[in-house]
Amino acid sequence: MKILEVNCGSSSLKYQLIDMEDEKVLAKGLVERIGIDGSILTHKVNGEKHVVSEPIKDHRVAVKLVLEALVDKQHGVIKDMSEISAVGHRVVHGGEQYSDAVIIDDKVMESLKDCSKLAPLHNPPNIIGINACKAIMPNTPMVAVFDTAFHHTMPKYAYIYPLPYELYERYGIRKYGFHGTSHRFVSEEAARLMGKDISELKIITCHLGNGASICAVDRGKSIDTNMGFTPLAGLAMGTRCGDIDPAIIPFLTNEIGMSIDEISNIMNNKSGILGMSGISSDFRDVEEIASFKHDRRAQLALDVFYYRVKSFIGSYVAVLDGVDAIVFTAGVGENSSIGRAEICSGLTYLGITIDEEKNNIRGKATEITTANSKTKVFVIPTNEELVIARDTKFLVQKKISHKSK
């Protein structure tokens, strides 16, 4: 069974074709600048790159180009589209309705549109991608896999905000959490590396990238996470502020005369590492300037980031009543050995001892603590695409088995 995994942004489309017999990636690629000048498809097979530069006016054209690349005589990996058994779509927000992946039908599409008000930047492009695939592959099953689904196991006291309860009942204002597919994958991988069943373990997963969140995983289930109603909450991120005093918003409105749109733009696009450093949202740039140029604001931005991560880890140790393992993943979590060392240096009360040599290993799942470390620390490259493909395969096979009965 071959599964096409698709992740649509407002002007981009990432994809992987995975053979589920051995979970091998046959091809992967990225369509950029959809509907914008300079559109480009980068298609990769066995490390070789094939680039198509031509106008791509919308996502339907992008999907068509991807499928043409997959069946191309020179760069393709399948004979025709019938070899694609199903398409798995990443969908950011499933609201309260979806606690698991689901086969997409008309009812599901209506629900996804309803959820768009909760994720106006993310769900609409996801829906556009689904519609584009359905138009070109009308007989191929489509599956939605939700970023929010893993966090459906949070207890109510963890996700309810201390606001009038009617706001939750009428408008769904509550903590939802995001990056769930990533937190799920790396927590399961950590259990595998430890040689233990995940049902025996308490794990804190740190998805640290341009967007960042931390999750408390108790015996395989998310019981708390620090992103909230939107992905703006929690840690300081690349351009997002994370948790701040909500009274700052009316202050900026009343004292400075900023509009809500202006404030939203500042909090989402001009804050975080970029806002504090005044240099870049890219952690690598800020680390380099802090290290080699001794830039104080760059160092301050890093210190705030490290502090917030340590603070949430400490909070989740309390929530879990102990911890067996901490996992770092995503761009910063996987690649910043300095960042991991700084964060873990404040966690000595957990009996963590970092092995400096192991901490410098990149590109593979690795334990970076010494043999006598009481709490294990892992660096695990995330693989959300594989989780989406696995969930898609499971649902399609389940549907086939029901039909055969």
Swiss-Prot record:
Substrate binds at R90. Its EC number is 2.7.2.1. The active site is at D147 (proton donor/acceptor). It catalyses: acetate + ATP = acetyl phosphate + ADP. Its main location: cytoplasm. The record marks H179, R240 as: Transition state stabilizer. Mg(2+). Can also accept Mn(2+). One of its GO terms (molecular function) is ATP binding. Gene3D superfamilies: 3.30.420.40. Pathway: Metabolic intermediate biosynthesis; acetyl-CoA biosynthesis; acetyl-CoA from acetate: step 1/2. GO terms for cellular component: cytoplasm. One of its GO terms (biological process) is acetate metabolic process. It comes from the Bacteria. SUPFAM superfamilies: Actin-like ATPase domain. Pfam families: Acetate_kinase. Homodimer. Catalyzes the formation of acetyl phosphate from acetate and ATP. Can also catalyze the reverse reaction. Belongs to the acetokinase family. This is Acetate kinase.
